[in-house]
Regions:
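Eukaryote-biased activation of long, low-complexity terminal tails and linkers
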Residues: 1-234
């Protein structure tokens, strides 16, 4: 999307006014997917194009962007070059676990944005083809997000069909709580992980869409204290 937008910028002044009109541009997708196979996808845009967009487009539209989709490679350029005062929806696409975790722990710009502005968040963690994913990392990332995002309403956490990223809370010592989250989409390892989410931790949850990797006998019991839960899909 953004590469097409850039191709129309600076054609004429009148055309710029039309293309960059705040009535039309509210969502900005800073990815460009190249699909080698169903499981092998690249989301990065060309470096030269990225630089031009950050220099020529973002300063002109940053104040009107409500929704932003950004991948790991362009994160530094897009998030750190300019602020987005109207941004409330953020999608972080194709991130490595460790890099995403570092952003959540150490990057003050990202932490401030999540804490003060974001109400809708999508997280896509890329598959590790050289080693098994560290599922405890995912549970830590999940807990950090709930802790940081004070006004989070909707969260899509690693719920993408072409990914194998699965979250588990079996080994986690983190305490996942949110008093604002109403919609959660997530992939988990076992039914026990599902039970973990259905207690007082997410007391405002009304919609839970969950993929459970392993459906097996469990000693746990469903103690659903999420009084507002009206939709449960697995």
């Amino acid at each position: 999307m953004v590469d097409v937008l850039y191709s129309f910028v600076n054609v004429t002044q009148r055309f710029d006014q039309l293309i960059l009109n705040p009535l039309y541009i509210h969502s900005l997708d800073m990815t460009s997917m190249t699909m080698k196979s169903y499981l092998d996808r690249i989301y990065s845009i060309d470096n030269q194009l990225l630089d031009r967009i950050c220099q020529n487009i973002l300063p002109r539209i940053h104040h009107q962007v409500n929704e932003l989709i950004v991948e790991q490679h362009s994160m530094e350029h897009v998030i750190h070059t300019i602020n987005y005062p109207q941004l409330f929806s953020l999608s972080l696409i194709d991130f490595q676990e460790e890099i995403l975790l570092n952003y959540l722990i150490d990057n003050m710009t990202v932490r401030k944005l999540l804490t003060e502005q974001i109400t809708c968040l999508k997280i896509d963690v890329k598959d590790n083809i050289t080693a098994l994913p560290l599922r405890e990392n995912l549970s830590t990332i999940f807990a950090l997000i709930l802790s940081l995002c004070k006004g989070l309403i909707e969260l899509n956490f690693c719920r993408f069909y072409h990914r194998s990223s699965i979250c588990t809370f079996e080994l986690s010592s983190t305490n996942c709580k949110s008093s604002t989250l109403t919609v959660l989409k997530i992939s988990v390892k076992s039914f026990d992980d599902c039970l973990y989410l259905l207690d007082e931790r997410l007391n405002c949850l009304s919609t839970l869409i969950i993929y459970v990797e392993e459906i097996a006998y469990t000693l746990g019991t469903i103690d659903n204290t999420v009084a507002r839960l009206t939709m449960f899909n697995h």
